[in-house]
Amino acid sequence: MEVAIALREQPEIRELFEVLEGNGLKKERQEVESLVNYLEGMESQFGEVIKELKEVRGQLEQIQDRGIKATAARLLDSAEGKVQEIGTQIAFVKTNLVRSAKNAVHDFKEKGVDALRRAVSAMKIPAALSALKESLHSGMESMERNAAKIGIVGGELNRAAQHTKNAGRALIGRRIKEPAEP
């Protein structure tokens, strides 16, 4: 398996940091660094979510009831789709950031500090961060709704199993048990 280079270790990003710092553009460096930190954090969380979804997929295989299994599978497919959308967005922003960093350094070398400042400003980092956060928030809300639905289905399945056991107890003359509250 190929190990990806961390975003902050990409040559283009490192060179941009050096150029910004060397020319006293601290605000611009902080903006770029905040985007890099956010993207690296999202990438880490993305990996964890993918791992958890694989575990849930494995647990889904244990469900015997076909109807419930199909419903849970649809909800899981939807969640996986949202996660893949977010992963695609992360990759897109990373690629654009590396390309923009390369262009900014190139502009600096040809035209000077003002061109560097304009190039970093053109990256619209605060707007990109805001859009990423909104997209992530929307995706997380959707996945939370799906997780809640799966939880409700599981709870109903447990209660149905308890009711079935109680019906059997009633048929043989045993005392029925009250269903436990979820």
Predicted feature residues:
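Leu/Val/Ala/Ile-rich N-terminal alpha-helices, chiefly Sec-type signal peptides and the beginnings
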Residues: M1-Q84, T88-A91
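Membrane- and interface-active hydrophobic/amphipathic segments that mediate membrane binding, fusion
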Residues: R57, Q64-P179
